[in-house]
Swiss-Prot record:
Residues bearing glycans: N38, N175, N314, N360, N455
InterPro entries: Papain-like_cys_pep_sf, Pept_asp_AS, Peptidase_C1A, Peptidase_C1A_C, Somatomedin_B_dom
Gene designation: TINAG
Species for this entry: Homo sapiens
Primary role: Mediates adhesion of proximal tubule epithelial cells via integrins alpha3-beta1 and alphaV-beta3. This is a non catalytic peptidase C1 family protein.
Pfam families linked: Peptidase_C1
Protein name, as recorded: Tubulointerstitial nephritis antigen
Tissue: Expressed in the kidney cortex, small intestine and cornea.
UniProt miscellaneous comment: Antibodies against TINAG are found in sera of patients with tubulointerstitial nephritis, a rare autoimmune disorder that causes acute and chronic renal injury.
Higher taxonomy: Eukaryota, Metazoa, Chordata, Craniata, Vertebrata
């Protein structure tokens, strides 16, 4: 019996000793974690700890023996420090002023609640009251030790990117730095810019290409392959809402180069349109494609090299830097030198009246293959800004406040070809190849693919083209 009691007592004492060691070692574990983020402090002596200035124990109070509640924020290391006697060991986790205050003062102030400085913290950094920082498209102000942020819907939204990339939609989304910090409203206001088509434009009779109905259309076609060096890549409209000007100038330049069989291959100037298309001109605040084509026919454009894009789009308010006059024989000539004085050629390029191509998929393909790229007026929604690669189709936001996150607006692009791919399930997926005007860092080197034959985003609803206005001396 006595032997059993001794075993029981021994087991109890062993357990108590083990628990005490575990308890005492906990601060050691915390200490290791505490100093992992600041290795210089871990290796340092008491002298190194002294380089941090501030009142910690002096504000918080000192504690006898061990007191794990005797702790306060150590802001310089973005961690915690202690003001009890237990902290003063070989690897000290004491606050910087422990030795100068707790050891020297004979009477310690009473133990108080942790002291926190005025202001706010963000990612370990301290900000004073009234500081303002940006969180994507929202401004946050430090007020009463809390961040108070505006509640705008941002153009770049991580949850929408994640939704697209996790879903089986056939395309992938990306966070673009040029869109970061913009609200959804700003994106639609500054990155599109084509006004809805006028009734006159929509009432135009559709024309069909002269290719025979039995023409065998290839599965894959790209205009730049058929006419190398005669078509033009995407430019970047930046925050100038003028897709109406960029798409019109690009389609016209391609058509003139193809029609002249490579004699005139200059890209035409969208800035010329933005600054000079005077009647009802909105410039970088949107415009109409019918007015753009009117200007090309009546006044003409110079090359992009002659009239390049302004770095500061507010400069468009200074008016038109180019003018032309008729020679009485159907041609117009510039009356001013190029705004870019390095470029000497100020030749004026003109087009015939625009015509509407049939919305039939096959007819659009025939037109592109026979005469060159065409202009398409599409409807852009919020997910399109995130497009990186694949065959685009609109993905509806699953956000609970979905209406707040949805917008729809007109945009003008250039269709340059088409193709077909096998989908994940083995089915055929047809697509158009289109050039956007958001620079080559967006999408597939400035281009995008979009579902073909189903009028995705109204891409096939309104197709516009034109002929170059060439005199007999211009033609090859």
């Amino acid at each position: 019996m006595w032997t059993g009691y001794k075993i029981l007592i021994f087991s109890y004492l062993t357990t108590e000793i083990w628990m005490e060691k575990q308890y005492l070692s906990q601060r050691e574990v915390d200490l290791e974690a505490y100093f992992t983020r600041n290795h210089t402090v871990l290796q340092g002596t008491r002298f190194k700890r002294a380089i941090f200035q501030g009142q910690y124990c002096r504000n918080f109070g000192c504690c006898e023996d061990r007191d794990d509640g005797c702790v306060t924020e150590f802001y310089a290391a973005n961690a915690l420090c202690y003001c009890d006697k237990f902290c003063d060991r070989e690897n000290s986790d004491c606050c910087p002023d422990y030795k100068s205050f707790c050891r020297e003062e004979k009477e310690w102030p009473p133990h108080t609640q942790p002291w926190y400085p005025e202001g706010c913290f963000k990612d370990g950094q301290h900000y004073e009251e009234g500081s303002v920082i940006k969180e994507n498209c929202n401004s946050c102000t430090c007020s009463g030790q809390q961040w108070k942020c505006s509640q705008h819907v941002c153009l770049v939204r991580s949850e929408l990117i994640e939704q697209v990339n996790k879903g089986d939609y056939g395309w992938t989304a990306q966070n673009y730095s040029q869109f970061w910090g913009m609200t959804l409203e700003d994106g639609f206001k500054f990155r599109l810019g084509t006004l809805p088509p006028s009734p006159m434009l929509l009432s135009m009779n559709e024309m069909t290409a002269s290719l025979p109905a039995t023409t065998d259309l290839p599965e894959f076609f790209v205009a730049s392959y058929k006419w190398p060096g005669w078509t033009h890549g995407p430019l970047d409209q930046k925050n100038c809402a003028a897709s109406w000007a960029f798409s019109t100038a690009s389609v016209a330049a391609d058509r003139i180069a193809i029609q002249s069989k490579g004699r005139y291959t200059a890209n035409l100037s969208p800035q010329n349109l933005i600054s000079c298309c005077a009647k009802n001109r909105h410039g970088c605040n949107s415009g109409s494609i019918d007015r753009a084509w009117w200007y090309l026919r009546k006044r003409g454009l110079v090359s992009h090299a002659c009239y390049p894009l302004f770095k500061d789009q507010n400069a468009t308010n200074n008016g038109c830097a180019m003018a032309s006059r008729s020679d009485g024989r159907g041609k117009r000539h510039a009356t001013k030198p190029c705004p870019n004085n390095v470029e000497k050629s100020n030749r004026i390029y003109q087009c015939s009246p625009p015509y509407r191509v049939s919305s039939n998929e096959t007819e659009i393909m025939k037109e592109i293959m026979q005469n060159g790229p065409v202009q398409a007026i599409m409807q852009v929604r919020e997910d399109f800004f995130h497009y990186k690669t694949g065959i685009y189709r609109h993905v509806t936001s699953t956000n609970k406040e979905s209406e707040k996150y949805r917008k729809l607006q007109t945009h003008a692009v250039k269709l340059t070809g088409w193709g077909t791919l096998r989908g994940a399930q083995g089915q055929k997926e047809k697509f158009w190849i289109a050039a956007n005007s958001w620079g080559k860092s967006w999408g597939e080197n400035g281009y995008f693919r979009i579902l073909r034959g189903v009028n995705e985003s109204d891409i096939e609803k309104l197709i516009i083209a034109a002929w170059g206005q060439l005199t007999s001396s211009d033609e090859p």
